[in-house]
């Protein structure tokens, strides 16, 4: 995940310039035919990274506006915010993030369609000093529905997220936010498939005009390869679709059963 976002308002200033690599270790299983659970442990590394040069070349090749990137050194790490609270992190490091647990009930689960309801709880196992945690327990509830055809699959999710506290933004992020996801997958034979996904979320921090802390919209484009009968390889990228509302670009690679 590579980001360079610089904003200044009358009472607030934000600079997010760095690269974050996250390894998510997840275990998912079924309790009964209708109930499933999932536990995820993230390992997060923040650094100056190495993708700034490649992103600059991408902008030049396609004639895109590089935004604030031209004014900042390459491969530096600065996470700075001044407002009700002050954040200034410039130290690289690898740390455990917030561990999450989720449980889902499947009202319907067949070859043609799926309907499920989920609830999640995130524990403050990360560090507020390294920005790998907000220092509070967080909850979320959402519904998921999917429809499958011979070569196409479409899925929709709608939910609410509620932090139970906030130690990063002095309580300003203790706000309920809504999120939504729409995904479409096209099978290309028995081995490969392509997927496009749109994720949106409402404001996550109150009392700010900073665009990066407001509503967000992200576009995911990726591919899935069936490696064995059980295992799948997923790869692709996530782009900030609304501009300056999320990390500039995120590349992902995952193995799932």
PLM segments and residue spans:
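Transmembrane beta-barrel domains of Gram-negative outer membranes and organellar outer membranes
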Residues: 1-164, 169, 173-257
């Amino acid at each position: 995940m590579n980001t360079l976002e610089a904003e200044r308002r009358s009472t607030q200033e934000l600079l997010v310039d760095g690269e974050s690599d996250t390894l998510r270790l997840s275990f998912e299983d079924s309790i009964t035919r209708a109930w499933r659970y999932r536990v995820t442990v993230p390992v997060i590394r923040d650094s100056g990274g190495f993708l700034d040069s490649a992103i600059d070349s991408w902008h030049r090749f396609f004639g895109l506006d590089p935004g604030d990137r031209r004014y900042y050194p390459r491969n530096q790490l600065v996470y700075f915010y001044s407002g009700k609270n002050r954040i200034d992190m410039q130290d690289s490091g690898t740390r455990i993030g917030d561990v999450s647990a989720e449980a889902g009930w499947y009202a319907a689960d067949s070859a043609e369609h799926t309907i499920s309801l989920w609830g999640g709880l995130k524990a403050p196992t990360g560090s507020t000093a390294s920005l790998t945690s907000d220092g509070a327990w967080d909850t979320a509830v959402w519904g998921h529905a999917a429809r499958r055809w011979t070569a196409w699959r479409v899925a929709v999710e709608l939910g609410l997220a509620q932090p139970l506290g906030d130690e990063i933004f002095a309580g300003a992020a203790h706000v309920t936010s809504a999120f939504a996801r729409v995904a479409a997958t096209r099978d290309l034979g028995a081995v490969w498939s392509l997927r496009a996904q749109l994720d949106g979320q409402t404001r996550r921090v109150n009392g700010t005009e900073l665009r990066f802390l407001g509503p967000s919209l992200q576009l995911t484009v990726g591919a899935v390869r069936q490696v064995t009968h059980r295992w799948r390889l997923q790869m692709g990228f996530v782009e900030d679709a609304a501009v300056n509302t999320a990390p500039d670009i995120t590349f992902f690679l995952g193995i799932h059963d």
